[in-house]
Amino acid sequence: MLSKGTKVGAPQYTVEELTALVDEAHSRGLKVASHAHGTQGIINALHAGADTIEHASFIDEEGIRLATANNAALSMDIYVTEYILGEGASAGILEESLEKERMTGSTQRANFRKAVEAGATIVYGTDAGVYPHGQNARQFSRMVRFGMTPLQAIQSATVTAAEVMGWGYDVGKIEAGFAADFVAVKGNPLGNIELLEEPAAVIKGGVRYR
């Protein structure tokens, strides 16, 4: 999307190339995240055995079916389109990229809803680095707006993400024996998910940073 001279949706690797990459990574105990907006690129990555699909903007019913069957997770950053189209130009994002975003954002959100309704595994993802750190919690309310319950959105960033990354034994839960990583908010985020945008406390590894 932000790369110069690229066409939205055009796959850049064959299934054979992707399979070689995935097999090598898995043989070393590594997870594979596939950066894919386009329908065919998503399907290629899923056939190759990718563990997660980043963006998945133009995923279709076949892609959703494959992701579910393969237990692959979708990381669909549906807030970022608002930042890019609202503040991107002043932040130096090229018009070429702004035009790509105009072509993509609404479709990605519609497909996010379809993936949620189909029961696909969805993990919280924000395309970190595109917009200022600290705004990333805005993703939660968009996930709820486009089909998730507040609990599902919170789980996508905690227990579900931990399990997808293979870290479910150590993080993702508030439970004895797990890392003391959590935030506190003034109220119940199950009733108002936007509370997560203003945490009253941030604890990482048992140390309070805010």
Residues of each region from the PLM?
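Small/polar (Gly/Ser/Thr/Ala-rich) solvent-exposed segments
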Residues: 191
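His/Asp/Glu-enriched, well-ordered alpha-helical/loop segment
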Residues: 27-31, 96, 104-188
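Active-site core of metal-dependent hydrolases
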Residues: 2-108, 128-130, 147-149, 162-165, ...
